[in-house]
A protein has these predicted regions:
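Intrinsically disordered, low-complexity regulatory regions enriched in serine/threonine/proline
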Residues: 67-142
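Amphipathic, interaction-prone secondary-structure segments
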Residues: 30-85
Length: 142
């Protein structure tokens, strides 16, 4: 679900804004889109989705945009949802170039992987997102 559609109170709005700022701390050239989907349907309510667009294709990160999906468990009580996992996809229209998921071994896969420094920064973003949501998330070993 679009990040903008998940805002139901100030605490959730703060977490969403902080998540975007955290990403931009490591990738300051990226612009954030809080509504990456044209429409949001009921089947996507278990995610908070962002898109981060770069001013052009970046050979360092091997993409033009990154789709960031925060997998959540929302109990419907208006509190900040529990963060279950993170999926990032490096995209060049119309295809995915790489992906990393925080389920399993956190291994980055794909046909065109980012440079080491950018890979390390993407993993740091994931770790810091877990810290950001730690008030409602179960502990994560990474």
């Amino acid at each position: 679900m679009n990040a903008s559609s998940n805002v139901s109170n100030v605490e959730i709005a703060n977490k969403i804004a902080s998540a975007a700022a955290l990403f931009r701390k490591y990738f300051p050239d990226a612009s954030v889109n809080f509504s990456p989907w044209d429409n949001t349907n009921e089947s996507m309510q278990d995610t908070i989705d962002f898109a981060f667009h770069f001013p052009g294709w970046s050979p360092l990160i091997e993409c033009r945009a990154i789709l960031l999906q925060l997998r959540i468990e929302n109990d419907g009580n208006g509190r900040v949802p529990k963060l279950l996992g993170i999926i990032m996809r490096g995209m060049i229209v119309p295809s995915e170039r790489w992906r990393v998921a925080t389920i399993g071994d956190w291994e980055m896969t794909g046909t065109h992987l980012p440079q080491k420094e950018q890979k390390d920064n993407l993993i740091l973003v994931c770790k810091e997102l877990y810290k950001l949501f730690s008030t409602t998330s179960a502990g994560n070993k990474n």
